[in-house]
UniProtKB/Swiss-Prot annotation:
It is found in: Cytoplasm. It comes from the Bacteria. This is D-alanine--D-alanine ligase. GO terms for cellular component: cytoplasm. HAMAP family: Dala_Dala_lig. The gene is ddl. ATP binds at residues 128-183. Cell wall formation. Its cofactor is Mg(2+); Mn(2+).
């Protein structure tokens, strides 16, 4: 497997730069351990010129957030004819737009929460939905900008119309789903397993719960019935296929089992660029399934292509 020259794309200039640096450096170290020649490329606005001069055999995309997972870098790599990992242009752009991704998922028969897309400046003193509900930037990851509006809040939060809001004007408002945080990775069209994410000291799986030390506990395999476990794996594969993902993806779910074991399973979103440190969710699932981190990233390099 080794011998190829791999450019690991990391860093970038989105709000998820710190996450990308962690993912990229972890992947670079693992690939070096597998015998690949690795060049770390901290992505800037001149990335096309840098890659055109470097001409690697493969670009390992360890970017997160806008530019890295919205089809932009994928389009640059297609233009340069450099094979790359993860999903292609269309799937990346579609998955990054939460509202459009939900429409595609719903059309494929995947259960989603009711929602509406609106301009944040259209928020008035009246709630757009009956609380509780969740407000999400349409095109952000890592739970940046997510606001939960609770039952006892009489007005929408003021931050949404503040000049300090950095996440764009389009937001998605969806009903709040009570329940447990479950997530399922998909590799090469097959489910890797289901993990329950238990936030520690947080109301939901926000940025700090995801990335701060001790912010959450990962339970794998999730302590749910075999029926629900299989259902979530099936839905994750369906989402992977419906969106058109390639390589690896991760779908997030809410499972409300307060009233019955069957409960309600709701698909939240698919992540085409999931975190890639050894302790991130997808590598943990792969390890539980018997695939080492080095083997996982090597597989991704060998799977790389253009026209994904």
């Amino acid at each position: 497997m080794g011998g190829k020259h791999v450019a690991v794309l990391l860093g970038g200039f989105s709000s998820e730069r710190p996450v990308s640096l962690s993912s990229g450096n972890a992947c670079a170290l693992a690939l070096e351990g597998e015998g690949y020649k690795v060049t770390r490329v901290d992505v800037g606005r001149d990335v096309a010129a840098v890659l055109d001069e470097l001409r690697p055999d493969v670009a390992f995309n360890a970017l997160h957030g806008p530019f890295g997972e919205d089809g932009t870098i994928q389009g640059i790599l297609e233009y340069l004819a450099i094979p790359y990992t993860h999903s292609g242009v269309l799937a990346s752009a579609l998955a990054m737009d939460k509202a459009q991704a939900k429409k595609v998922a719903a059309a494929a028969g995947i259960p989603v929460a009711g929602e509406r897309v609106m301009n944040r400046f259209d928020f008035t003193s009246e709630h757009p939905l009956q609380p509780p509900y969740v407000v999400k930037p349409v095109r952000e990851g890592s739970s940046f900008g997510v606001v939960i509006v609770k039952e006892d809040q009489s007005h929408p939060p003021q931050i949404l119309t503040s000049s300090e809001w950095p996440f764009g004007n389009q937001v998605m408002v969806e009903r709040y789903i009570h329940g447990r945080e479950l997530t399922c990775g998909v590799l090469d069209g097959e489910a890797l397993g289901v993990t329950e994410v238990v936030p520690l000291g947080h109301n939901f799986y926000d940025y700090d719960a995801k990335y701060a030390a001790g912010g959450s506990k990962h339970v794998i395999p999730a302590g749910i019935s075999p029926k629900i476990y299989q259902k979530i794996q099936t839905l994750a594969v369906m989402a992977h296929q419906a969106i058109g993902c390639r390589g690896v993806s991760r779908s997030d779910f809410r499972y409300d089992d307060r009233f019955s074991e069957d409960g309600e399973v709701i698909w939240l979103e698919v992540n085409t660029q999931p975190g890639m440190t050894p302790t991130s969710l997808v590598p943990e699932m792969a390890a539980h399934a018997g695939r080492s981190f080095g083997d996982l990233v090597s597989w991704m390099v060998e799977d790389a292509s253009c026209l994904r």
